[in-house]
């Protein structure tokens, strides 16, 4: 009986100890700039944040099980939104969008499993089209068009597996 009780207590202690040591999530990883200011805080689960060396917020990215997962946002030092990036399992996934400091949309890029996949669009600060490119699995495939700032089409080509077709 005493042996059974000792065994059960030992087993219980071992189980509790193992769970408390190995069951906890890692602490938040912190990095600092040379000037001593906080550069980034990256949790195993939760919202990671980074700052510019001057202290302004630089980015916020959600983490699940130590991997980027969800909608991340980045800002210019002046506070204007720079990018929104969708992540899934530590890779870009879905539509990412970028802006000029002035607030006008700079571009949109589709991603699948961390690679360009879909139409990549860019605009001038005026809002006029700058370029449209098509990608499949990270490689340019399809029509590419580029415009001058006045709206004049200056280039049109077709790409297959990253190589321009010569007509």
Residue ranges of predicted features:
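Glycine/tyrosine- and acidic-biased, solvent-exposed loop/turn segments at the edges of beta-strands
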Residues: 2-5, 15-167
């Amino acid at each position: 009986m005493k042996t059974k009780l000792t065994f059960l207590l030992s087993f219980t202690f071992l189980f509790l100890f193992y769970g408390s040591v190995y069951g906890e999530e890692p602490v938040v990883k912190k990095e600092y700039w040379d000037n001593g200011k906080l550069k980034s805080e990256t949790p195993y689960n939760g919202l990671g944040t980074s700052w510019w060396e001057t202290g302004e917020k630089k980015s916020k990215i959600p983490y699940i099980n130590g991997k980027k997962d969800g909608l991340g946002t980045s800002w210019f030092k002046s506070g204007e939104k720079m990018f929104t990036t969708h992540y899934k399992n530590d890779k870009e996934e879905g539509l990412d969008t970028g802006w000029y400091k002035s607030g006008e949309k700079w571009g949109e890029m589709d991603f699948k499993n961390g690679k360009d996949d879909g139409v990549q669009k860019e605009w001038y600060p005026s809002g006029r089209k700058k370029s449209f490119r098509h990608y499949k699995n990270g490689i340019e495939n399809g029509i590419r068009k580029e415009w001058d700032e006045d709206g004049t089409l200056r280039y049109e080509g077709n790409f297959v597996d990253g190589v321009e077709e010569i007509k």
